A protein has these predicted regions:
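Conserved positions in beta-strands of structured domains
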Residues: 29, 46, 60-62, 91, ...
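Short glycine/threonine/proline-enriched tight-turn/helix- or strand-capping micro-motif at secondary-structure
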Residues: 6-14, 25-55
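Zn2+-dependent peptidoglycan hydrolase active-site motif and core
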Residues: 40, 55-94, 120-121, 208
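Short acidic, glycine/serine/threonine-rich helix-capping segments at coil-helix boundaries
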Residues: 192-206
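Short, well-structured beta-strand-loop connectors
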Residues: 52-63, 95-110, 206
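Primarily a LysM-type cell-wall glycan-binding module
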Residues: 154-187, 204-212
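Conserved, short, structured surface segments that act as functional micro-motifs
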Residues: 75-78, 99-160
Length: 213
């Protein structure tokens, strides 16, 4: 299986049959960047709790429910151009999983579910093969325009996300792999997969550093 991301990848996200819509047009509160030691994998766009949030492209809803990992009410749409888009912190969900949607379809209303320390905003991500890249590489919210129908991304466009997405835990007394799986909303099998030196029978010692994401 080919590794992703490659050195570079050309994505054609629009063609003559595709339509597109910027999900919300307002000011950007926070961009795609390292923030407080963690990489922020999308844009935080200001809105109100009554602002309609729209699908960026035609596609199929893969996820539409409350997410306990910090996204709150989250909609994920898998698009026919190969990309996925994430719409987080919604106050209301207006679509269901496996529903086909057109670009511009209202998928929910703005909110701040999943976060306690900030006002209403849309956290918006664009991903290719589950690797996020800067949404402002394909459109400008400030100018309300798309920046073309293709984008050439290099490995560096994904690199900081890959590195910063890794999370480690140092074992304390009494902690087990099952405990880590529950705490970090994952599974034991996934933890073992990203820690090749561990197996289900490994002895977990105090002070051991284990990757959990």
């Amino acid at each position: 299986k080919d590794k992703f991301p490659p050195d570079s990848v050309l994505i054609t996200y629009l063609d003559d049959q595709d339509k597109y819509v910027i999900p919300v047009i307002d000011r950007i509160n926070s961009g795609f960047k390292l923030r407080n030691g963690t990489f922020h994998k999308g844009l935080d766009i200001h809105l109100t709790r009554t602002t309609p949030v729209k699908a960026a492209f035609n596609g199929k809803v893969r996820y539409a429910r409350f997410n306990t990992g910090g996204y709150g009410n989250l909609v994920i749409i898998r698009h026919f151009n190969g990309l996925e888009t994430y719409y987080a912190h919604l106050s209301r969900l207006d679509v269901k999983e496996n529903q086909l949607v057109k670009a511009g379809k209202v998928i929910g209303l703005g909110g701040n579910t999943g976060v306690k320390w900030s006002g209403p905003h849309l956290h918006f991500e664009v991903r290719d093969h589950d690797f996020a890249f800067d949404p402002e590489k394909i459109f400008s919210i400030k100018d309300s325009v798309w920046l073309g129908d293709k984008i050439l991304l290099k490995k560096a466009d994904f690199h900081s996300v890959i590195a910063a997405s890794r999370k480690y835990h140092r074992i304390k007394s009494g902690e087990t792999l099952s405990y880590l799986a529950v705490r970090y909303n994952t599974t034991v099998s996934k933890i073992l997969k990203i820690n090749p030196k561990l197996n289900i029978n490994s002895i977990i010692g105090i002070g051991m550093k284990i990757r959990v994401r």
